[in-house]
Design a protein with these regions (language model features):
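Flavin (FAD/FMN)-binding glycine-rich loop and adjacent Rossmann-like elements that form
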Residues: 1-158
Length: 158
């Protein structure tokens, strides 16, 4: 990937110089040393939150996130996007939760990553205290604990 981007950069400047530009006013100022990965992987969750689902209301909603790119609607974060489909006591948080497309762009930022981390940590603590599993703390008890620290789950609560 890095070599390909360097090759493209060299080709771009060859073309510009062939069109008459000179090195006096046309040159790369900075060349990235690392590939810019926004997302490399995500879990296959019990629910994949797609852009088509992002306007839905979910019974297992554990938080809300907004569209920070353009003014837009507030979306619900279902608990199932934090739970890997085939693992019992594992929670995901941050950029690796089960989302895709535009929803990935909306959830990859620090506020949503931090929120999902707090939710996953709270769920793990509740499961440990109750001797339960990740799916076992969905709904009631988890939402009750999150509401205690002022989480909102549905748009009409705003």
């Amino acid at each position: 990937m890095i070599r390909e981007s360097r090759r493209e950069l060299r080709n771009r400047y060859r073309k510009l110089y062939a069109e008459g530009r000179t090195r006096d006013d046309c040159f790369p100022l900075l060349v990235p040393t690392l590939a810019n990965f926004r997302r490399t992987f995500s879990i296959r969750g019990r629910l994949l939150l797609t852009p088509e689902l992002s306007g839905e209301q979910f019974d297992d909603s554990v938080g809300l996130f907004g569209n920070w790119i353009t003014p837009g609607p507030v979306h619900e974060l279902p608990y199932r996007v934090l739970l890997p489909a085939e693992l019992e006591n594992v929670w995901a948080a941050g950029r690796c939760i089960s989302v895709t497309g535009e929803t990935c762009e909306l959830t990859r930022v620090i506020p949503v990553a931090a929120m999902s981390g707090e939710i996953a940590g709270t769920a793990a603590a509740l499961a440990a205290d109750a001797g339960s599993s990740a799916p076992g703390v969905a709904g009631g008890r988890l939402q009750e604990e999150l509401r205690r620290v002022e989480f909102r789950f549905h748009r009409e609560e705003l």
